[in-house]
Each structure stands twice: as C-alpha cells, then as structure tokens.
Amino acid sequence: MTDRIRPLIAGNWKMNGLKASAAEFEAMLAGAAEVTGKADLLVCPPATLLAAFAEKTRGGKAVAVGAQDCHAKASGAHTGDISAEMLADAGASAVIVGHSERRADHGESDVVVHQKAEAAWRAGLVAIVCVGETQQQRDAGLTLEILRGQLTLSLPEGSRADNLIVAYEPVWAIGTGLTPTAGDVEQIHSFIRQLLIVRFKEQGARMRILYGGSVKPSNAAELMAVANVNGALVGGASLKAADFLAIAKGC
C-alpha cells in the first residue's frame, strides 16, 4: 500500500442481494466507525437495492454506495440498460466499468469500457475501471502485454486521481479461491503505476490501484501491505458485513 494514498475497500455484490440483504448493509454502517481511520468504504449492490442503500447513508454515513455498470448513453432506446445519470440520481457516487464478467458475458471491449468511464464522469461519478488477464493469457506469459493494452484503450484522456480508480483483477483468481503471490501482485501493481505515471504524470502517481480476486479476511492484510496496492475490490466476501469490515481492518 502506498502510504500517501488513502485505501478504498469496494464491495461488488454482483447479482446477489434481495431487500432482506439490507440487514448486512446496515451492519456495515454500524461497524464502519471502527475502520474509518484505515480506509474508505464503498458498496456496489445490484441496481434494485441502490436507491434504498443510498438512502440509508444520508447524513454522512461512512459507507458510500456505487453501481456495478452503466450504459454509455445518457438516455434512449436501450431496453434493460441503466445510464450513469440514473445511477447518480439514485444516490451512487461511483460505478464499476469493465469488470471481467461484463467483458466475458457481454463482449465488452476496451473501447466500450472507455465510453462507460466517460459516461460516469458526465454524471459526476467516479469510474472504477477493471483490467486483468485470463489463465490462458497468464500461462502464455502475456499478462503485462494484456494489461498495457487494456489500460491504454480503457482509460480516457482526462483521467485524474479524483475521477478514476484502476482495479487489477486477475480473471483466473475471481471466485476461485486462488490468489497470485504477494510478489506477483507487487510486480503487476508497480507496472500499472508506471504506466499511469507515464501517461497521466502526477495524477497517475496519486490514482488508487485496487487489487481484486478472492480477497478475504485471511489474506487481506498481506495483500494490503504490498506496494502500490491502495485497497481492494471485494466480491463474495463483501456480502457479509463481518468479512467486509475485517478486510478493511487489514489496511
């Protein structure tokens, strides 16, 4: 973790959660005071829960609410899609774009991710841009090449530390229980940092780089201690308040 960059623990609930899940979110709000000295907290529930969760954070609660995806357009004939403006109106402060599951399940290209990041800014949201390699790409020794291409095309000009966060998520580690070694994470996050600095100068030096991929309480402290790891994008472990807060305590 880079000391001068305040870490962010972002929970991605994916396609999980019904109205009854509000109890877990309320438990996160109740326990957030214990970790506010260590990290910022963000929870990205499914769109059906976004407004209700955002309402619970009114009055300056220590957990922000975000979204998992947005359409590039502000409105129009796009059945089933949700615009960044709608997310902001519902109370979101950030939105994940380019998650590997969106790239794989919906064929989203780097160009589409770029457009969605710009849409997030248009609505006043922070864009959390995800990048990462598959197992096949890793085995072929292509990890850094893949990341360079994704970062080059997915990150818009105008990216700043206050409007964009990069999340490195090795696809082979998501939901598998597998994680790269601390040494691997350090190498890759250092590579990402250097690319950000070359392109965005001082802003690139200050951008948060999150690690995502089977982050859990048992490995959080080790991962958060790695240089240039400025927090985590947490999947399954963010569904339980106790696990989510324990990960934040590892910062």
UniProtKB/Swiss-Prot annotation:
Residues binding substrate, per UniProt: N12, W13, K14, G175, S214, G235, G236
Keywords: Cytoplasm, Gluconeogenesis, Glycolysis, Isomerase
Bilayer-crossing regions: none
Entry annotated with the keyword Glycoprotein: no
Enzyme class of the recorded protein, top EC level: isomerase
A Pfam family matched in the record: TIM
GO molecular function, one term: triose-phosphate isomerase activity
Catalytic site: H99, E169
Pathway, per record: Carbohydrate biosynthesis; gluconeogenesis; Carbohydrate degradation; glycolysis; D-glyceraldehyde 3-phosphate from glycerone phosphate: step 1/1
Main function: Involved in the gluconeogenesis. Catalyzes stereospecifically the conversion of dihydroxyacetone phosphate (DHAP) to D-glyceraldehyde-3-phosphate (G3P).
Record text on subunit structure and interactions: Homodimer.
Similarity remark: Belongs to the triosephosphate isomerase family.
Protein name: Triosephosphate isomerase
Organism encoding this protein: Bradyrhizobium sp. (strain ORS 278)
